[in-house]
Amino acid sequence: MRSIRMRAEFQGEHVSGAERIVPYHEVEKTVLELLKRPRVYDKVVITVERLKDVEIVPKALPILSYDFKSVEEARAFAVSKLVEAGVPKPVAELAIKLLHEGPNPKGGNMRGAVLMDVETGERLEPDRERGIRTTRMDWKDRKYIKEVLKKRGIKREYLERLIDALAVATKNVYCGVLAELCWSDDPEYTTGYVAGPHIGYVRIKPMKEEGVPIGGRVYFIRKENLEKIIQCLQEKPILINNL
């Protein structure tokens, strides 16, 4: 199997990223597909890596969806679900505030996720500008998963986002992340989610106002598991079998 990772930049800023795990004979076709993903860019980096010992995860997190009339209501609900997942309310509220203001210490977005101590709210990622990226995950049969989600009523324009985000959230749980908070930095996309082993993958709209280019991810973890979780998130390859 091969891991194929695409990263696109425009004027020095990250604008698009995607990843696939495919058999060797599908590498060329997949690279061409990933090159079509960024809408605008001045630099694209494609990495192809041979993988060993790919773990099969039987099922993804179950999907639930909720719509609210305001960002305030949506975020309050997100906090309640994070509390249900085991995150203390002050820590959940701190994470919301962090993503709202921009998690990069220099202002704006990070390339990866914040790692937050679930008990204290302390930031644990070694590089607070870069963060931690969850990589080397995909679906065993991506085409089949797309068809199933279409039949469930997921709109075509949201499919790729949902499939990619659900794979990330599922791998995070596999690696020991206790809960996750996320919303996109895409100004036009206001749906975010919270996720965890006990709450599933919970889509929530709107987690921010339209036109806001700030977003990111917060992973809630136990501090004593930091090194093990980082290694798993960044290095352990997994394929998800089914929904």
Swiss-Prot record:
Pathway as given in its UniProt record: Metabolic intermediate metabolism; pimeloyl-CoA biosynthesis; pimeloyl-CoA from pimelate: step 1/1
Keyword Protein biosynthesis among UniProt keywords: no
Top-level enzyme category: ligase
EC number: 6.2.1.14
Catalytic activity: heptanedioate + ATP + CoA = 6-carboxyhexanoyl-CoA + AMP + diphosphate
GO biological process, one term: biotin biosynthetic process
Cofactor(s) this protein requires: Mg(2+)
Keyword flag Acetylation: no
Swiss-Prot/TrEMBL keywords: ATP-binding, Biotin biosynthesis, Ligase, Magnesium, Nucleotide-binding
Subunit structure: Homodimer.
Cited function: Catalyzes the transformation of pimelate into pimeloyl-CoA with concomitant hydrolysis of ATP to AMP.
Listed NCBIfam families: bioW, PRK01322.1
Family named by the database record: Belongs to the BioW family.
Name this protein carries in UniProt: 6-carboxyhexanoate--CoA ligase
